[in-house]
Structures are given as structure tokens and as C-alpha cells.
């Protein structure tokens, strides 16, 4: 997402009751987008950065006013730096060993990534051994029709990517996708 479209796209998501917006650091000018969103939404929405893979990024996103750091991997150094900077910290994990290491490092929640490679039965097995206070969020390949299975397995939420927004999408397309995810969440709540 670019700074030119970030406010309009994000407003469409907020209108659909999305309360957390993550700007991937591999986007064009991500720090500028984060600063714009923080200024625009103030405390109404949690603004964060995704694809956080180094210590320099932690400093940059904290200075930009982000409140959330999401990583594709589990790095003890990055988790500790993010926590020291006051950020909500969600590292990526794929195994129980990685999950326990990130919990010990101070992670606030865990990103099960890539979820395409970890079907709901894997999440259920992980939830059986991990502390119940730690939320697990499947990310990667999540679509509205997959939400119910993951929620039944114990998902505490989801990270949404290209099924919600891809470069070049219009605001209306993103709003339609947001509606589809909201419907998927309602269906999964009824199925529980």
C-alpha cells in the first residue's frame, strides 16, 4: 500500500469495524504510511508494522507512532527490542518449540505463519500445549471460508493479507472483501 492510498483504504476498513491496521514494511514508503495513519486515526485504531525483520525497523516504527510489531519469523532480539520500545509484539511461529521461545522472549501473541502449511489440526495441537493466555493468530492464506475451521481449532483472531487487499484494488473492492471477512467471522461464531 502506498501513502497516496493508505488513508482512504484504511478508512474503508475502519468503517467495516477493523480495529487494527498493519502496514507491511515491504510496502512503498511504509514509515510515511504509518505516520499518516497514526496522525489520522489517533487512538481510534491500533496502527502497526508487519514484515518486521530487523532492529532498525523497530526503532523506526516506534518513532513513527506505531503500537504494533508483527514479524514473519521468531527473533528473540527483535521481540525484546519491540517490547523495550513499548510495542505490542507478535512474532511468527510454525512449531511449538518456536512458540515457547517467543513466549519466553515476551511476545504478546503469536502469528501462526504460514497458515496454509499449518491446517487447523496443527493449531489445535499447539493450543493444547501452549499457555491459554497467549493468543494465536493464523496468517497466510486466510479466506472467509477458512475462518470457522481455524476458530474451532482455537484461533483467537486472524491476520489478513492479499484476500483483503492487493495493490491496485479500489476502495470499493477492499470494502467488499472486508464485508466478506466480517460475514466469515459471523459464520464461524455461529458454528462454534
Region spans (language model):
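Conserved acetyl-CoA-binding loop of GNAT-fold acetyltransferases
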Residues: 18, 107, 154-157
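Conserved anion-binding
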Residues: 29, 44, 56, 62-149, ...
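Conserved N-terminal beta1-alpha1 strand-loop-helix module at the mouth
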Residues: 1-67, 74, 84, 144-145, ...
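Small side chains
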Residues: 10, 157-159
Amino acid at each position: 500500500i502506498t501513502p497516496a492510498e493508505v488513508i482512504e483504504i484504511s478508512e474503508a476498513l475502519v468503517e467495516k469495524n477493523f480495529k487494527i491496521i498493519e502496514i507491511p514494511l515491504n510496502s512503498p514508503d511504509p514509515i510515511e504510511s504509518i505516520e499518516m495513519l497514526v496522525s489520522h486515526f489517533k487512538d481510534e485504531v491500533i496502527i502497526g508494522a508487519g514484515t518486521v525483520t530487523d532492529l532498525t525497523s523497530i526503532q523506526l516504527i516506534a518513532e513513527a507512532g506505531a503500537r504494533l510489531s508483527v514479524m514473519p519469523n521468531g527473533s528473540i532480539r527483535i521481540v525484546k527490542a519491540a517490547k523495550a520500545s513499548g510495542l505490542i509484539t507478535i512474532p511468527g511461529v510454525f512449531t511449538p518449540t518456536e512458540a515457547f521461545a517467543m513466549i519466553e522472549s515476551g511476545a504478546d501473541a503469536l502469528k501462526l505463519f504460514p497458515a496454509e502449511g499449518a491446517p487447523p489440526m496443527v493449531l489445535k495441537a499447539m493450543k493444547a500445549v501452549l499457555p491459554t493466555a497467549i493468543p494465536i493468530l493464523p496468517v497466510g492464506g486466510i479466506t472467509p471460508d477458512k475462518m470457522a475451521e481455524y476458530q474451532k481449532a482455537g484461533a483467537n483472531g486472524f491476520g489478513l493479507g492479499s484476500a483483503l487487499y492487493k495493490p491496485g484494488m479500489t476502495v470499493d473492492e477492499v470494502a467488499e472483501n472486508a464485508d466478506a471477512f466480517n460475514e466469515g467471522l459471523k459464520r464461524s461464531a455461529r458454528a462454534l
